[in-house]
């Protein structure tokens, strides 16, 4: 039996549940009799163990099961009768005061309910829509990047099929150098401060700028000693903020040869006949696909920000806590896949709270927008989205099979389509401002949502 619902806070509720002990005892005895049929004990045949022994061994466990079942059933019935949408799981505790009637046990179930979501006027929402032009200059830049990805090196000063690298035999930006080095702090070598035959490309930023500067201008066989100040935020905590002295010896210099933009280069990019114009058109299509994806992500973020701004709701803490746990687990799995020892890393929940609160808030808002405007994902939309994914792979049919053979994978696509439906709906109602953005800005790493 459950009492009326008490309101403790905006979303917090409490129900008091009373369970007659006679009902509990009757159910316990019933379950123990069923269990006794299969209980084994030394000196007794299966199913012939005395009930007293069965009760001694299993009574406490069965009583807990019965109480959990009865309290859970009473809670669910009370929530249903009062039309309550419970957010998360209730906290159920025995009531400690003396209000319980004789022959009963009383529990308090404290929980949160889903909030009322008040959607504002979409016509008053401001949404920014990014626009980007893919020009010939962007195609040229991409070709340069593709050339650098296919770079190969030749020893400077030695004749090769592509020349000897010129008369300047000193190390300069773009060269790959091989060195021995040793570093000391106050005359003492430190961990990670010594290496032999260490190769890196000057100008790529793999090494600290002062280290690269100490290498530039040297010839093979030359050595140099110079001071190097480690930044205070350097990843090596033992040397961060300290000044070391490095001695380097240059052992080899290799100059970079970039492939010519010719038919062979085009073939290496998947153009069978090596036609350079086809290559440029293919690059443009790929760039436009990537630009479209990033613009869509930016626009979606702008729409979500607008929805948050115009909507009013209280977010259940229980749902935030659940999402914090999900984010923590996702982070652990991601780090483990990268080979990191997760057990050595702290995961304070507060690191994820802000992100979880936004995710939960948006989820509640989106659900309300979808329900109010009938924006559910339609089967043909889901199919079209999967086919779009498949086009960027070598074997589209395998991708289609991958999604359509697993309901959970298809559900992920449905969620994306649903979000897109909401975005398109909001764009049709809100005040949309187009914002031209430079190609490089859009494609920079921190531009992707």
UniProtKB/Swiss-Prot annotation:
EC number of the protein: 5.2.1.8
Biological process annotations from GO: 'de novo' cotranslational protein folding; cell division; chaperone-mediated protein folding; protein transport; protein unfolding
One of the record's GO molecular function terms: protein folding chaperone
UniProt catalytic activity: [protein]-peptidylproline (omega=180) = [protein]-peptidylproline (omega=0)
Compartment(s) where it occurs, according to its Swiss-Prot or TrEMBL record: Cytoplasm
Residue ranges annotated for the PPIase FKBP-type domain, each copy included: 174-259
One Gene Ontology cellular component: cytoplasm
Entry domain remark: Consists of 3 domains; the N-terminus binds the ribosome, the middle domain has PPIase activity, while the C-terminus has intrinsic chaperone activity on its own.
Function according to Swiss-Prot or TrEMBL: Involved in protein export. Acts as a chaperone by maintaining the newly synthesized protein in an open conformation. Functions as a peptidyl-prolyl cis-trans isomerase.
Family annotation (NCBIfam families): tig (TIGR00115)
Family matches, as HAMAP family: Trigger_factor_Tig
Family: Belongs to the FKBP-type PPIase family. Tig subfamily.
Protein name per the record: Trigger factor
UniProt source species: Janthinobacterium sp. (strain Marseille) (Minibacterium massiliensis)
Gene name of this polypeptide: tig
